């Protein structure tokens, strides 16, 4: 008898709609691969009852808080249910851009200069030291909540007088916010599947940066896979991504986003331990380039679950 698989989708985070699309695609792909899979939306179903409902494994197609941040992973561990993707600690660290950057920096890996602020600091009013640190980043900067995905709450700031509004928006989504030096690009993403690093993808958004609309709604965003890098550059990028991935303790599958600045240096942006699996999504695109169908990809991800 085959295992009964729960595909967790939807949820309650800011990325619910993306997750519903990801989950529907994953469900179809698993069923095409002969897997006995069923959709489960934690917003509507008590996921603490998954075991009593007869499920033996879980495919996590949730994005953002409550699905990608270690909390769900911890619950599944306590229940003794194998699940896809990274464990508790790696999921929590990857969801937290600030702590990811601190770990990467500590490991000697390249990250863009940044300033971190708490909501309390912002509401109190920034002191001269903080203002000087922000000023040292130059303009433009990118302002982002530390623990949101899909570019939710993110803004590019090109003029000093726009910074307050950008911070206000970011603080609507998190207690901690990053102000990062703007890197001119292009942006790359590299997917990891088990021990295999898939071909890199170069991302060319129509707008100024790769925001929520460019990721999920726009047909004008262009993706290049293979990315067009020279062999040595591709090898260097893959080596950097592998170090970034293992530094956070990630496993199973996921994605690391990287920027190539005008100085020819790669800089790590963030790790995604439960990436999108929609029609616009990048892991399926990289897998396709590596000769793997969508169904083969999701079945392989499930096989890696522990």
Swiss-Prot record:
Co-factor(s): Mg(2+); Mn(2+)
Binding site residues for ATP: 134-189
Keywords, ordered alphabetically: ATP-binding, Cell shape, Cell wall biogenesis/degradation, Cytoplasm, Ligase, Magnesium, Manganese, Metal-binding, Nucleotide-binding, Peptidoglycan synthesis
Subunit field text: Monomer.
Places the protein is found: Cytoplasm
An MF annotation (GO) of this entry: metal ion binding
Annotated catalytic residues: 15, 150, 281
Binding residues annotated for Mg(2+) 2, in chain numbering: 270, 272
EC number assigned by the record: 6.3.2.4
Function: Cell wall formation.
Protein name, UniProt field: D-alanine--D-alanine ligase B
Residue ranges annotated for the ATP-grasp domain, each copy included: 101-303
InterPro entries (UniProt xref): ATP-grasp (IPR011761), ATP_grasp_subdomain_1 (IPR013815), D-Ala_lig_Van_CS (IPR000291), D_ala_D_ala (IPR005905), Dala_Dala_lig_C (IPR011095), Dala_Dala_lig_N (IPR011127), PreATP-grasp_dom_sf (IPR016185)
Family to which this protein belongs: Belongs to the D-alanine--D-alanine ligase family.
Residues bound to Mg(2+) 1: 257, 270
Highest taxon of source: Bacteria
Pfam families tied to this protein: Dala_Dala_lig_C, Dala_Dala_lig_N
One of the protein's GO biological processes: peptidoglycan biosynthetic process
Transmembrane segments: none
Catalytic function, reaction form: 2 D-alanine + ATP = D-alanyl-D-alanine + ADP + phosphate + H(+)
Alphabetized PROSITE patterns for the sequence: ATP_GRASP (PS50975), DALA_DALA_LIGASE_1 (PS00843), DALA_DALA_LIGASE_2 (PS00844)
Upper taxonomic lineage: Bacteria, Pseudomonadati, Pseudomonadota, Gammaproteobacteria, Enterobacterales
GO cellular component: cytosol
Cofactor descriptive note: Binds 2 magnesium or manganese ions per subunit.
């Amino acid at each position: 008898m085959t295992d009964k698989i729960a595909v967790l989708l939807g949820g309650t985070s800011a990325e619910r709609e993306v997750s519903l699309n990801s989950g529907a695609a994953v469900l179809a792909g698993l069923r095409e691969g002969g897997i006995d899979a069923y959709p489960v939306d934690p917003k509507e179903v008590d996921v603490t009852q998954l075991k009593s409902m007869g499920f033996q494994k879980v495919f996590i197609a949730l994005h953002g808080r409550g699905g990608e941040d270690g909390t769900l992973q911890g619950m599944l561990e306590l229940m003794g249910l194998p699940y896809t993707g990274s464990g508790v600690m790696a999921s929590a660290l990857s969801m937290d851009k600030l702590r990811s950057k601190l770990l990467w920096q500590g490991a000697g890996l390249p990250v863009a200069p940044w300033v971190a602020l708490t909501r309390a600091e912002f509401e109190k009013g920034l002191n001269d030291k903080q203002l000087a640190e922000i000023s040292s980043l130059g303009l433009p900067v990118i302002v982002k909540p530390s623990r949101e995905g899909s570019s939710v709450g993110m803004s590019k700031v090109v003029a000093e007088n726009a910074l307050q509004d950008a911070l206000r928006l970011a603080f609507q989504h998190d207690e901690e916010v990053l102000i990062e030096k703007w890197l001119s690009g292009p942006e790359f993403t590299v997917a990891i599947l088990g021990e295999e690093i898939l071909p890199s993808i170069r991302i060319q958004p129509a707008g100024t940066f790769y925001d929520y609309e460019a990721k999920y709604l726009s047909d004008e965003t262009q993706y290049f896979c293979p990315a067009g890098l020279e062999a040595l550059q591709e090898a260097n990028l893959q080596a950097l991504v592998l170090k970034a991935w293992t530094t956070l303790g990630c496993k199973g599958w996921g994605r690391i986003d990287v920027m190539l600045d005008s100085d020819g240096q790669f800089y790590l942006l963030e790790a995604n331990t439960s990436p999108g699996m929609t029609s616009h999504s990048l892991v399926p695109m990289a897998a396709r380039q590596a000769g793997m169908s969508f169904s083969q990809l999701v079945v392989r991800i499930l096989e890696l679950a522990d």
